[in-house]
A protein has these predicted regions:
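Short acidic, glycine-rich surface-loop motifs adjacent to enzyme active sites
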Residues: 1, 112-130
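Short active-site segment of divalent metal-dependent hydrolases/proteases
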Residues: 32, 125, 167
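Extended active-site neighborhood of metal-dependent phosphoesterases/phosphodiesterases
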Residues: 5-113, 134-142, 147-148, 159, ...
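Metal-dependent active-site segment of extracytoplasmic phospho-/sulfohydrolases and closely related
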Residues: 120, 157-169
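General beta-strand recognition
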Residues: 73, 229-231
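Transmembrane beta-strands of outer-membrane beta-barrel proteins
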Residues: 78, 231-233
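Active-site glycine-centered loops adjacent to acidic/histidine catalytic or metal-binding residues
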Residues: 1, 29-30, 122, 163-164
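A conserved, positively charged/aromatic
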Residues: 152
Length: 233
């Protein structure tokens, strides 16, 4: 919950051994936009806690951004259009969030000169069908996938890491919404905490699904002159 102080303290204390030595590059998620009574608002606490790079936009400053580290260009997206415009959000609504962000993203990727490009986004671009009685949702691609994936194809993004569904899925390389070894590698990152969501059917593009019931897991990435090596534990 984005305004629950004890949750922030607990999480920040738990990562202190890491954050004391390694800079954090955070990605905005939906819970960072929740109030104490589970309404929605601007992510004020999140923006106050993390000094990520500016993006040049006064309204959406630091909600999405990019940075270079070694041979990798990292792009961190804001996928909170739904929360930014929800009827329970009593702050200023932002129906133009994705329009503004896409313009920035295209300019950012066009100027990129690094060997590797990695995108991080909270909402997963793939749409999974519910695996529970009485619930129905078509499998395919979410609105964020329909919008952003063609841009990732156009600028030859190498790796896309997403979250939100509390499960690990490796979809392999995808281009033009289909299996293609020349496309970006799409990995849905798994569970770092105790919130289990074992309610998703397998997607036709899944190449690996974590064993269920899923346990806590994390990922590492190693950059070599010729490879990006991603491992999940």
């Amino acid at each position: 919950n984005g305004e629950q102080d004890y949750q922030w303290r607990t999480w920040l204390n738990s990562i202190r051994p890491l954050s004391a030595n390694v800079p954090l590059a955070t990605t905005l998620g939906n819970h960072e936009m929740y109030t104490l009574d589970w309404k929605m608002r601007e992510p004020y606490a999140y923006l106050n806690y993390f000094a990520v790079p500016p993006n040049g936009n006064e309204i959406f400053n630091r909600r999405y951004y990019s940075y270079d580290f070694g041979d990798v260009h990292y792009v961190v997206l804001d996928t909170m259009l739904y929360e930014s415009n929800h009827e329970d959000n009593h702050d200023t609504h932002h129906p133009d969030l994705y329009d503004v962000e896409v313009q920035w993203l295209r300019q950012d990727l066009a100027a990129n000169t690094k060997k590797w490009t990695v995108v991080l986004m909270h909402r997963d671009p793939f749409r999974y069908a519910f695996d529970r009685p009485g619930a129905s949702r078509d499998v395919g691609f979410d609105d964020e996938g329909v919008l952003f994936m063609p841009i990732f194809d156009e600028f030859n993004v190498d790796l896309v890491l997403s979250a939100h569904l509390h499960t690990y899925r490796n979809r392999g390389h995808v281009r033009n919404f289909d299996r293609d070894p020349s496309g970006p590698l799409y990995i849905l990152t798994g569970i770092a905490g105790d919130a289990r969501r074992p309610k998703w059917k397998q997607h036709p593009l899944d190449v690996y699904v974590a064993p269920q019931p899923e346990t806590n897991n994390y990922m590492s990435m190693t950059v070599t002159p010729n490879k990006l090596i991603v491992k999940s534990f």
